[in-house]
């Protein structure tokens, strides 16, 4: 719109999730008119991240080194392994500060419609890891979508001979949630997964 370089900046900002044409233009204009030093710092941080951040060899999350800090931490419980779809899921669980085990990132979920099979995910490495390490409980923390449920079931079948306990995250009523606002599927799951007080 203004110049070819401006248009290129807008185009690249639009690759971010949730950023449309107008938002990308506003961001570009903001960086160029008011925040040039921060824009340069952003460009440098992005360049370094894209060059230096790699996939952890053990858990497949992101790391600055071959093995991420979570996998290197000797205070973590090796008997607990939490399986998630993405590195974003690792960050979400870590923010709760309630889990002290290890992680394994699948790299997505099974989705025949999208052409994603077990061969496209890190499932083979997961089975190998469970066979080699002292994992007593495998926690399946995949999404509650049909694809997430299918992925959890597939993994459960694949590792059942190698792990004592395979569990799934509880599903149901969120904290502070009102029953009348829940969809029937969520409420049904909550009824099936009720617990003792």
Swiss-Prot record:
Zinc finger (C4-type): 56-71
Short name of one Pfam family: RecR_ZnF
Keywords: DNA damage, DNA recombination, DNA repair, Metal-binding, Zinc, Zinc-finger
Keyword Transmembrane helix among UniProt keywords: no
Domain of life: Bacteria
GO biological process, any: DNA recombination
Family annotation (InterPro entries): DNA_Rcmb_RecR (IPR000093), Rcmb_RecR (IPR023627), Rcmb_RecR_Znf (IPR015967), TOPRIM_dom (IPR006171), TOPRIM_RecR (IPR034137)
Keyword Zinc: yes
GO molecular function, one term: zinc ion binding
Toprim domain: residues covered: 79-174
HAMAP family: RecR
Family statement: Belongs to the RecR family.
Function, in words: May play a role in DNA repair. It seems to be involved in an RecBC-independent recombinational process of DNA repair. It may act with RecF and RecO.
Protein name as it appears in the record: Recombination protein RecR
Organism, as annotated: Psychrobacter cryohalolentis (strain ATCC BAA-1226 / DSM 17306 / VKM B-2378 / K5)
């Amino acid at each position: 719109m203004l110049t070819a370089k401006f248009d290129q900046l807008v185009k690249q900002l639009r690759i971010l999730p949730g950023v449309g044409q107008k938002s990308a233009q506003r961001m570009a204009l903001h960086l160029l008119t008011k925040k040039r030093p921060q824009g340069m710092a952003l460009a440098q941080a992005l360049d370094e991240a894209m060059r230096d951040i790699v996939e952890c060899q053990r858990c497949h999350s992101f790391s600055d080194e071959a093995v991420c800090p979570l996998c290197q931490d000797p205070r973590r419980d090796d008997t607990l392994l939490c399986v998630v779809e993405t590195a974003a899921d690792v960050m979400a669980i870590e923010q709760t500060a309630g889990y002290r085990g290890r992680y394994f990132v699948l790299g997505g979920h099974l989705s025949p419609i999208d052409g994603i099979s077990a061969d496209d995910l890190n499932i083979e490495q997961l089975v190998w890891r469970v066979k080699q390490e002292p994992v007593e409980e495998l926690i399946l923390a995949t999404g509650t979508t049909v694809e997430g449920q299918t992925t959890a079931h597939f993994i459960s079948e694949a590792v059942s001979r190698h792990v004592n306990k395979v569990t799934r995250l509880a599903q149901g009523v969120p904290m502070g949630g009102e029953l009348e606002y829940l969809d029937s599927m969520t409420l049904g799951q909550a009824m099936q997964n009720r617990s003792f007080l």
